[in-house]
Amino acid sequence: MIQSVRIKNFKNFKNTKIDGFTKLNIITGQNNAGKSNLLEALYYLVGKSMHPCTNVLEIYDNIRKEPLTSESKSLMFYGLDTKEEIQIVTTLDNNQTLDLQIKFIASENQKVIESQIIPTAEQTQMSSQLNFTLKKNNEEIYNDHLNIAKVPNFPPIPNQSGYNRQFKNFDSNQLQKLLPFESAVIIPSDVVYRQAHMIQAVSKICSNNQLEEELNKHLNQFDNNIQAISFNTNNQLKLKVKDIKEKVPLSVFGDGLKKYLHIVSAFMADNAKTIYIDEVENGLHFSRMRLLLKNTIDFINNNKDGNLQVFMTTHSQEFIEILDQVIREKDFAHQTKLFCLKQDDQYVIPRTYYGENLEYYFENEENLFG
């Protein structure tokens, strides 16, 4: 499991270290304090594919919906200053480290392009580069460039003219060296952005009768009128609902059910050992927040390897109060921490609150949100 992270020159993090992560980590803080940015920094290192270039592109293209170009690339750098390289270092609880450094390299052609008002078509496609260096325990595993065009095709289509975002994949030896680091799943605040990922996860679950039955039970807990989930011939998710003859498309249900399904299916279908959930409370009634937290703790406790780790961001005082109740009921307080991020001048300052003391913090009217 991830024990700590140090983030330098990434978005609003000039130089911040956060220590003491546990199995269930709740991230709070004021608006623009860096809650989502923290999840993204961790995901850059350990994303679904375990490849930093792929992880960065996924955040830009599928989460932020801001295609990575020679212009938008500066958004990942602190103060938009691409002269300083990004560094993200995570340490596991066994003291193994994973270190990612990202450096922008502007081509001479790109410098000319950016000085002109109207570039030619040929100049528009000339690419700059992001250099990625990935180390494990100070041993270099990967060092290569991701080419980025000024105006890429979007959505990006490989092997098409103008698609300049090539990079070198890991070979089997590099992948072996990355063990025991495991892949991760990120769930954004707006689940519509990741609809394809949810469909893929549910498809995997429905190919296994036992898992499909378990998923149906989870959906029935959320809404006891829901009896089953399935795909139609057009690969559209539909739900069998009590007293309705025709199956009902998932699209007509509210965001709360979609968010719940997305999270539960990620726990069930993915082999990820780390799950990042942004603005977990979005769309959820307080009773369903309780249900989600109970299920999350059950997934962590029932993980066969005992190393499943969850990070959630929230703005909701109500969610934290429900969390306090659930972790005491489930005897999980000692494996829960709350990290409050506060922007203090140039730096993000983390404050740590312990799950077993949440009730005490409430009684003393402690500000848990910065």
Swiss-Prot record:
Any GO MF annotation of the entry: GTP binding
E.C. number(s) listed in UniProt: 3.6.1.-
Keywords: ATP-binding, GTP-binding, Hydrolase, Nucleotide-binding
pH-dependence of activity, as noted: Optimum pH is 6.0.
Thermal characteristics: Optimum temperature is 45 degrees Celsius.
Catalysed reaction equations from the record: ATP + H2O = ADP + phosphate + H(+); GTP + H2O = GDP + phosphate + H(+)
Role of this protein: Has nucleotide phosphatase activity toward ATP and GTP, but not toward CTP, TTP and ADP.
Full protein name: ATP/GTP phosphatase
Organism listed in the record: Helicobacter pylori (strain ATCC 700392 / 26695)
